[in-house]
């Protein structure tokens, strides 16, 4: 039987009483006389929105927040020499109509702030507290809307001496893996060492072929003009219940054993695949066409998740590639099958989505974007922060107590978080659904674990 991490929301601080002390622009330490632009791939093009993460640190007497703030500012200035695009601005190239980055040296944001609370008084760091948005700055009030930085770093000190690093990046700048590399490089400079992994900023490595060649059906993508509903990336004003379900390493192990018993061995039975299969079954069976109706078992459900393609291309992308080197894998099936098929078969369907993404398939998807200007679309997207390892980065003042994204109301996205207790094999599943769907989701979650 599965157990929810939070049966009901904990008491959350609605206001962290954060005061902005200083808001400035920072620039690369090495000036360049060459004005250039950075090409953005078709994968980057559709990710023009901000991603915000918060990294909480316990007090360290050897590193008071004031000292940490100054060290971070100096390290970021130096780091932007390697990541100069972070000081640039997004623009639309009038000749092509494509987004690119104008590497104009306009600067990144650096904000210092203070909260009237201690870190402990913030309470549960895992539960998606909307107030955590106060720990991140996405727009600098001193700048016009068309001149906002792609990267803003905020350090917020707490009364106990702990602090939070809040980072807002436009998603065109990094994917999860390259952002982890960025944090590791930042930590290296803070340790007064060379960059651990010098970045590869050449986005033309994922440029579409000329002429484009779409060799596969791409059910995971939809053309802009063909989609009347919102994308999986848009927030909703609909009231949603948040619930976090915790899966221990032992429960994940049992799910893998159960899947192995009923699978045909064509795909690997991984922790991610079994958790994603569990989420897909629960989400699909919780959706009703109309209020009060049961789930239409003949309805097709599509689940999406990101797959890193760095090692799948020929030639392979450098591991240090900074852009979005992820494509959307999918699995598609009728709800009837998700209800009746053995769990191992559902896991196979999930795994086949990843297995499908070969070099040729990836190039076909990129070329599809060149021709049709669309985006990923499905019933649910699993966004996994589970094994990105942000909390494993070792800074001079230690590792984060917890690292997490700032969560907004998105009912079509289920988030996977690592265990705050350091058990990297356990996972939190965060779902945000209307109340009636949430009760069904929980029912099927517990039913699947039985």
Swiss-Prot record:
The keyword Cytoplasm appears for this protein: yes
UniProt note: phenotype after gene disruption: Female gametophytic mutant which exhibits embryo development without any endosperm due to a successful sperm cell fusion with the egg cell but an impaired fusion of the second sperm cell with the central cell, thus resulting in single fertilization. Embryos can develop up to the globular stage in the absence of endosperm.
GO biological process, one term: double fertilization forming a zygote and endosperm
Pfam families recorded: Transferase
EC code(s) of this entry: 2.3.1.-
UniProt subcellular location: Cytoplasm; Nucleus
Transmembrane segments: none
GO molecular function: acyltransferase activity
Principal subcellular localization: cytoplasm
Signal peptide: none
InterPro entries: CAT-like_dom_sf, Plant_Fungal_Acyltransferase
KW Cytoplasm (keyword) present: yes
Protein's job: Required for double fertilization of the egg cell and the central cell by two sperm cells, resulting in the formation of the embryo and the endosperm. Involved in the regulation of embryonic expression of PHE1. Essential in maternal tissues to ensure the paternal embryonic expression of several genes, including RPS5a and FAC1, both of which being essential for early embryo and endosperm development in fertilized seeds.
Protein family (similarity comment): Belongs to the plant acyltransferase family.
Protein name in the entry: Acyltransferase GLAUCE
């Amino acid at each position: 039987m599965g157990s929810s991490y939070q049966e009901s929301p904990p008491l959350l601080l609605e206001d962290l009483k954060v005061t902005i002390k200083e808001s400035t622009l920072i620039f690369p330490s090495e000036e360049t006389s060459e004005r250039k632009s950075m090409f953005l791939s078709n994968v980057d093009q559709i990710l023009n929105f901000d991603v915000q993460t918060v990294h909480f640190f316990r007090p360290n007497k050897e590193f008071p927040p004031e000292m940490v703030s100054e060290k971070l500012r100096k390290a970021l200035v130096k780091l932007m020499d390697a990541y100069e695009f972070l000081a640039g601005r997004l623009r639309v190239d009038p000749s092509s109509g494509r987004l690119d980055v104008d590497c104009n040296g306009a600067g990144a944001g650096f904000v210092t702030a203070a909260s009237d609370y201690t870190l402990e008084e913030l309470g549960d760091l895992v539960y998606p507290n909307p107030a955590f948005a106060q720990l991140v700055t996405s727009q600098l009030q001193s700048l016009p809307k068309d001149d906002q930085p792609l990267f803003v770093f905020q350090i917020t000190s707490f009364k106990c001496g702990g602090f939070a690093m809040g980072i807002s990046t436009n998603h065109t700048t990094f994917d999860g893996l390259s952002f982890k590399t960025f944090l590791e490089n930042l930590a290296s400079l803070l340790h007064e060492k060379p960059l651990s992994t010098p970045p590869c900023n050449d986005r033309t490595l994922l440029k579409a072929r000329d002429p484009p060649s779409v060799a596969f059906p791409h059910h995971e993508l939809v053309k802009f003009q063909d989609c009347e509903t919102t994308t999986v990336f848009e927030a909703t004003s609909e009231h949603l219940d948040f619930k976090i379900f915790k899966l221990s390493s032992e429960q994940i192990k049992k799910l893998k054993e159960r899947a192995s018993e009923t699978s045909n061995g064509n795909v690997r039975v991984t922790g991610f695949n079994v958790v994603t299969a569990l989420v897909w079954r629960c989400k699909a069976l919780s959706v009703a066409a109309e209020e009060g109706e049961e789930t239409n078992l003949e309805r097709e459900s599509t689940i999406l998740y990101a797959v890193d393609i760095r090692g799948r291309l020929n030639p392979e992308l450098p591991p240090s590639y900074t852009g979005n080197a992820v494509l959307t894998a999918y699995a598609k099936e009728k709800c009837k099958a998700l209800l009746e098929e053995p769990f191992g078969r559902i896991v196979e369907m999930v795994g086949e989505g990843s297995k499908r993404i070969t070099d040729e398939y990836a190039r076909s998807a990129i070329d599809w974007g060149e021709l049709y200007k669309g985006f990923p679309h499905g019933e649910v997207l699993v966004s996994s922060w589970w094994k990105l390892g942000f909390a494993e980065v070792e800074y001079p003042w230690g590792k984060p107590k917890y690292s997490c994204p700032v969560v907004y109301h998105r009912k079509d996205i289920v988030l996977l978080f690592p265990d705050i207790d350091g058990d990297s094999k356990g996972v939190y599943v965060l779902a945000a659904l209307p109340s009636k769907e949430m009760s069904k989701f929980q029912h099927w979650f517990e039913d699947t674990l039985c």
